[in-house]
Amino acid sequence: GNNACVNIEALTKRLNISFSQSDDFKCRPLRVGDKNCLFAYLDGNIDKVLFEQDVVRPLKNAERLSSPYLENLQNTVAYSDEIKVVPIENAPGEIALCDIAFFIEDDDNAYIFSLRKPSTRAIGEPPTSSVMKGPREGFVEEIKTNTSMIRRRIKSPDLVMKSFQVGRYSATTVAVMYVRGIADENVVKTICEKIRKIDVDGVVDSA
């Protein structure tokens, strides 16, 4: 395309706007050789271990990334599936499908890696005892499991996730999810304000 001058910083801003600054949307810059690159994905929906070892690490260790990019990417990463190539403007739709988009400065394509996390549990078996007695991370992971299950059902960049820490002592993580353009913005604002004001530690016991 003609707008081949892709600036990673400007692209990061554009992507964050596409995802309404959703708290589970992550942009991760990476320098490969002399190129500024960027990964964008939804946290909680990708297999982080495979992502790190098969994609990020080989790229970090690569001396350079040159055109033809698709061919060079396929030769560099340890990812065996086909890397899908889409125009940059289609990237948010691919990210909303829980895939990872990779961008290279001065290239107007997005390279899509599918490293989706397998669903960890069915809805309806909340592991209450481990949440209450176990480590805090378990609880944060649980939130990610729940939000990722919703992401799998509503595959849209307009699905926004905002997370909060509530309770002065328990610092419980709470997530609000809504669809931009469908949910009433004022209602969302009111709900978020009410959650921010929660100061009582009433979430400690769920028995």
Task: Indicate where each model-derived feature is located.
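Membrane-embedded alpha-helical signal segments
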Residues: G1-A207
